[in-house]
Amino acid sequence: VLIIAVLFLTACQLTTAETSSRGEQKHRAPRSTDKNSRMTKRCTPGGEACDATTNCCFLTCNLATNKCRSPNFP
């Protein structure tokens, strides 16, 4: 009886795998690339206005001038 149960469960798994590989899956999971593209933050280039919460491309905002630093800042 145990051998028959194992064979039955194996056959069920193979049938399910074959069905999903043919594209007959009804509810597909969202692609991870879609999620990653929505989560990507844009940075503010050097010389543009910024504050303490701005994501400057070169990592720092000069709070004295309220502008993102450029790549060749002193």
UniProtKB/Swiss-Prot annotation:
Keywords: Cleavage on pair of basic residues, Disulfide bond, Knottin, Secreted, Signal, Toxin. It comes from the Eukaryota. Residues 1-17 form the signal peptide. Coiled coil: none annotated. Disulfide bonds join 43-57, 50-61, 56-68. Residues 18-40 form a propeptide. Residues 21-37 have a biased composition (Basic and acidic residues). GO terms for molecular function: ion channel inhibitor activity; toxin activity. Expressed by the venom duct. It is found in: Secreted. The keyword Secreted applies. Belongs to the conotoxin O1 superfamily. The presence of a 'disulfide through disulfide knot' structurally defines this protein as a knottin. The cysteine framework is VI/VII (C-C-CC-C-C). This is Conotoxin AbVIL. It comes from Conus abbreviatus (Abbreviated cone).
